[in-house]
UniProtKB/Swiss-Prot annotation:
Protein name: Copper transporter 3
Function: Involved in the transport of copper.
Record gene name: COPT3
InterPro entries: Cop_transporter (IPR007274)
Highest taxon of the lineage: Eukaryota
Chief location: membrane
GO cellular component, one term: plasma membrane
Keyword flag DNA-binding: no
Amino acid sequence: MADMGRHGMAMAMAPAAAGGAGRRKRYMHMTFYWGKNSEILFTGWPGASGGMYALALAAVFALAVLLEFLGSPRVQESSSLGSRRRRATAAAVHAVRVGLAYLLMLALMSFNVGVLLAAVAGHAAGFLAFRAGLCGGGYKKGELAPAACC
């Protein structure tokens, strides 16, 4: 607690276990930052490569679009309550959707502004395509969309 006056934007990770003397020092950001040198979901990924960072942003964008598709009326109506098989399918789709939502949340916990913008853009594009009716199957007039909550 002697270093309370330090106002750095990163916090050093816990020291490596025995035998890890040759490891590089990693930082866990505690505030939003802009830069391609980040770790999203996995240690060392995407690394310092600009191309891998762009791929990571594209993956986050696609994941957000997929989440909007899985929550769209088209998917919800196709697995509406009926037979046991349809209810089981609806439960499986819901489980996949929640799992992917948590994965997206973990990606956002990298505190990288690019990841945040990719996720918001993906949700907006997915909403426009699947929920607002651009690709058909949107909500009818006067019908409210369910809250986008985990």
